[in-house]
Structures are given as structure tokens and as C-alpha cells.
């Protein structure tokens, strides 16, 4: 391999350490957006009451979904570990399922908070403010998925040095 090729590989290896940092930055941005959303007015008492029912329903849905998901994930984890004889691959799957679940949970928490605040902003401040709150709420889920995805994939690679997992 030429000197330039070795230098290129070295640079790529160093850049790989930036990926988890970018993932963490994405999660910090999601946290910032969440704080911004929570500062918005949640509307009048009736709006807050309806929002609490929506939040309660969303929580019930997530818990029912996660009960089924846990069974699937455990069974598939075992199938991967046994069939592929690669517990590292199975562990990477498990970590991905966990990170995905955390993303879904965070997204649902923020979505239920953003919904009532979007309605309140539309009522009190107009469409521009309502859209800002709504887009911020949706962005939290996207940033959580992206941030945790980058963090998970990069950590698996940095620990194993195996892109084939």
C-alpha cells in the first residue's frame, strides 16, 4: 500500500471517532428542543385535561407494544445467537432494539407535550408559532433516532472493529 493509502486509512480511522460525538450532539439537540417545547404554554385547563388523556392513552399503547416487543426481541436475540453462532451480532441486535425503543419512548413523550402546546400556540399566537412548536416536536423523534442510531452503530464498530456484525 502506498504512503498516501496508509495516510487515508489513518484519517478514516480517526474520523470514525467523530461519529459517536455527532450522535451525542444530535441527542443534545433533541434535549434542547424538548426544553424549548416545555417552555411553551400548554393552553387552558380544558386543553390540559384533554392532553392528559391523550398522554395516558399513548403511555398505555407504548406499554402494550413494548410487552410484545420484548418477547420478540428476546426470541430473535436467541435465534441470532444460536443460528449464527455469533453472540456479538445478537448483542448488536439487542442494543439496536433497545435504542429504537428509547427513541420511540422519547418521541412519544415529547409528541404528547408538543400537541397541546401546538394547539395553544395556534389559538394564542397564530400559525407561525404553532408550526414552530409542531416541527420542533417532530424533530425530537428524528434527532433521537439519528443520534442513538449513530451512537449505537459507531460504538459496536469501535468495540469490535468488525463492520460485518
Locations of regions flagged by a protein language model:
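Hydrophobic packing and interface segments
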Residues: 3-165
